[in-house]
């Protein structure tokens, strides 16, 4: 996790190993899920010799998440075992890459939500009808614009210098070890504001489109219920499932934005418990969202089940 605020160097490692194990598990699940999305959509692209808007967004989203979760895992490992210092070129590259891929991932997820909202929602406004008509033409430009915004925003972190020093030691009764906390001499408020400012536009887009889509689906579901005595209508059930999935996406997205803000603001650094919780929570969204995307897509879900079946058979043959 390439944070500009701090890293850990531990005298004793029990809690560190536990945190690293949990983070590695989350990142591995996320990388595998994103890899499945990438492979399935890439194969579909090659076979059809054409790429749909949804396929294009999913490809960009999954590739950005593979890179993001790889950086989170590498940075977590290096910070715990002190493989590299904060002043190294490697850390600067890692930090900028983390910010860029984070912004890209957030933008692509927001644009996917926006595209689904325009295609699925039903609102009787002339502007909305015009947007629905032109959305396929606009999306490629919006994707390129989001990449440009992400790259430009991440460059602000390229030349930001940090002077690291041994500041304090925190003692914890958990596992009986002492943790040395290294704090960067930087204007943390400015760093947190700058990073959060880049998160705000895609966060606003995602919340707005997901909320409006849920509202539209619920309204349509009530309309179908009133017109059909059969409460187990497949269309009603499909709408209910879409509402649940969108609600889960929205919850994970907001949770991730909150974790990013708290991580960059150093609010939780004085507490060993909350600092550990933030580190463990960071990979939850990219992994969880990718798994939910697979579960909501029949083709991806089938590939996911086949992979799990192969892993299960392999483990049975070994043990």
Swiss-Prot record:
- Parts of the chain that traverse the membrane: 17-37, 57-77, 98-118, 138-158, 188-208, 248-268, 274-294
Provide the GO MF annotations for this entry. bitter taste receptor activity; G protein-coupled receptor activity
An example Gene Ontology biological process = detection of chemical stimulus involved in sensory perception of bitter taste
Q: Which residues face the membrane's Extracellular side?
A: 1-16, 78-97, 159-187, 269-273
Gene3D superfamilies per record: Rhodopsin 7-helix transmembrane proteins (1.20.1070.10)
UniProt feature coiled coil, ranges: none
- One GO cellular component term, please give it: membrane
> What keywords is this UniProt entry annotated with?
G-protein coupled receptor, Glycoprotein, Membrane, Receptor, Sensory transduction, Taste, Transducer, Transmembrane, Transmembrane helix
| Keyword Transmembrane helix carried by entry | yes
Q: Where in the cell is it found?
A: Membrane
Q: Which residues lie on this side of the membrane: Cytoplasmic?
A: 38-56, 119-137, 209-247, 295-319
- Give the family this protein belongs to, as stated in its UniProt record: Belongs to the G-protein coupled receptor T2R family.
Q: What does this protein do?
A: Putative taste receptor which may play a role in the perception of bitterness.
Q: What else is known?
A: Several bitter taste receptors are expressed in a single taste receptor cell.
Task: Read off the PANTHER family from this record.
Answer: TASTE RECEPTOR TYPE 2 (PTHR11394), TASTE RECEPTOR TYPE 2 MEMBER 39 (PTHR11394:SF142)
Q: Which protein are we looking at? A: Taste receptor type 2 member 39
Species source reads Rattus norvegicus
